[in-house]
Amino acid sequence: MAPPYHGDTREFSMAPAKKIKAKIKKTLPVTGPQAPTVSELMHWYCMNTNTHGCRRIVVSRGRLRKFIWILLTLSAVGLILWQCAELIMSYYTASVSVTVQFQKLPFPAVTICNINPYKYSAMKEHLSELDKETKNALETLYGFSEGKSKVRRDAADWNSTGRNMQSKLLEKIPLLKFDDLFKKTATEILSGHKRKIEGSAFHQGSSMVNIGEPQDVVGFQLCDPNNSSDCAVYIFSSGVNAIQEWYKLHYMNIMAQIPLEMKVNMGYSAEDLLLTCFFDGISCDSRNFTPFHHPLYGNCYTFNSGENGTILTTSTGGSEYGLQVVLYVEEADYNPFLVTSTGAKIIVHDQDEYPFIEDIGTEIETAMATSIGMHFTRSHKLSQPYSDCTETGNDIPVANLYNKSYSLQICLHSCFQRAMVDTCGCAQYAQPLPPGAEYCNYKKYPNWMYCYYKLHEKFVKEQLGCQQICKESCSFKEWTLTTSLAQWPSSVSEDWMLRVLSWDKRQKINKMLNKTDLANLVVFYKDLNERFISENPANNLVILLSNFGGQLGLWMSCSMVCVIEIIEVFFIDSFSIVMRRRWQKMKKWWNDRKAPRPQEPPQVNAPAKEGHDNPVCTDEDLPTFNTALRLPLPQENHMPRTPPPNYSTLQLNAAFTDQLPDTLEGRSH
């Protein structure tokens, strides 16, 4: 009997199924996209992904550790989604970042106007009737007259003296004392007649001198000549304001009928307004100023207008290197009803900008030295979609009536003037004249006052549409002004300075100038640094992708490759597996329905189809570890522990065959 076989017994000690699995595992690796189920695919992904959290969920031992890693991973995913949502919202909010730079700059344009637009001595002829009626109204209201005591008259005296003082102008627009605003009753100041007030009341209040009791208000009523019930009532808590407003209405009507050449001659010349001039330490004169006629301020003059193509610059900052002028305003020739203050008005602006001195001008006092220090800021805003601004104004459906570059104020004034022409048939005096239009006056347009006030009311309430149409300019320049005052001239230098200035003015010594007629003005840069403010997009596509990458790397140690891997596994491969399984099921169902197989006798304990007999694992699929595990197992035949005998070795040679019987016979004996 042969000895037992002592080879490697480890292979025979393993179960047949485990041996096959171990053998296949060495030759067929597991590939994720070929996994038969999504759960196996997810297991493969967690074991092979670069995101550490997912791998730790699979390889961690113990439920607590797995739970902690699941919680951390989900928290990181939640933070990523939150931060990415914030980045996307920030990207679409069109926010901007601001850049500030400093550099040197040229000197701006400086426009100077006398507060009194025209010499009263030259205007008396045109304003004689208006001035007379204004004095009559003051005498009736306050008992005011030159050389008489200023005692206010009672209402009882109006019937006896007021009727004789009515005028043509006051008959059209009488001044009224409102007794009860709620009952809408008023009394005419001159006649004392009671009247019922029609229309809406618009309060133009003031804290100045009140007329009588606090409840007393004064105003006037403007009505449509074609419809007496359609009226607008303007009330004032001060008789001073009421008379001034009434005076300005008639004043604009008169000035609109005077030719421009005549108005220029009635205004102040550059030689009249300017006494001395210095710029950057160098003497200058009226030839350095460009004349400019303003509808409300008469003759104005612009220094460094750039009209000749040259813009002056200053060598350094400080008051000694700026513009220094002494102005002569001639207070004695002021219109007493039109203006109630003395001095000049200036505005600092760019050479391409229109000087809206009535809106943003700075007033200069007489008998004072006014120093104005400047800081210059140039700004540029981004247009759509970052802000609602315009680059050139060409996209605004409003014609520019000013011969200057676009600005929001130009657009608003042009829009109102165009609405005035379209609605009232004439143009308002304080603004440029549109092509083909003419200024309003009583004779040709008797309804213009009522129309103007009603239109202005809509404009203030933003019902005219101008505020919705006009946009801010994307590029604009701004000068921040700092004003300081000092008494000028001083008491010790007043005598000789006024004598010298009078001599320069070519006046006689016995008609020496008064310091209340003079104003000293200095305009200078505090420093020569320009502050440039520009807007740049705070978010763009590159920044968005960078922020996404930063969030993924911060919270999950994940790069763009990881993102592609996630897209491939969770979207492409998972979808492919699900669709492949559904397709195989649909295909099998269709084949079974189309060509049913013949019935076979039922088999008892028939083994389930596995491996390549399974329709899920067809020949189209590449062999994997999972599909190999489904191959049919071999029959379990017990193998001998010793090799079978070699029967051919038991055959005897022929030489011994003949001896065999003898041997057998000998043993038998």
From Swiss-Prot:
Disulfide bonds join C113-C300, C223-C231, C277-C284, C389-C474, C411-C470, C415-C466, C424-C451, C426-C440. It catalyses: Na(+)(in) = Na(+)(out). Residues 592-619 are annotated as: Disordered. Gene3D superfamilies: Acid-sensing ion channels like domains (2.60.470.10). Coiled coil: none annotated. Originally identified and characterized by its inhibition by the diuretic drug amiloride. Residues 89-551 are extracellular. GO terms for cellular component: apical plasma membrane; external side of plasma membrane; extracellular exosome; nucleoplasm; sodium channel complex. Its main location: membrane. PROSITE patterns: ASC (PS01206). Keywords: Cell membrane, Disulfide bond, Ion channel, Ion transport, Membrane, Sodium, Sodium channel, Sodium transport, Transmembrane, Transmembrane helix, Transport. It comes from the Eukaryota. It is a multi-pass membrane protein. GO terms for molecular function: ligand-gated sodium channel activity; WW domain binding. It is found in: Apical cell membrane. Component of the heterotrimeric epithelial sodium channel (ENaC) composed of an alpha/SCNN1A, a beta/SCNN1B and a gamma/SCNN1G subunit. PANTHER family: AMILORIDE-SENSITIVE SODIUM CHANNEL SUBUNIT GAMMA, AMILORIDE-SENSITIVE SODIUM CHANNEL-RELATED. This is one of the three pore-forming subunits of the heterotrimeric epithelial sodium channel (ENaC), a critical regulator of sodium balance and fluid homeostasis. ENaC operates in epithelial tissues, where it mediates the electrodiffusion of sodium ions from extracellular fluid through the apical membrane of cells, with water following osmotically. This is Epithelial sodium channel subunit gamma. It comes from Pelodiscus sinensis (Chinese softshell turtle). The gene is SCNN1G.
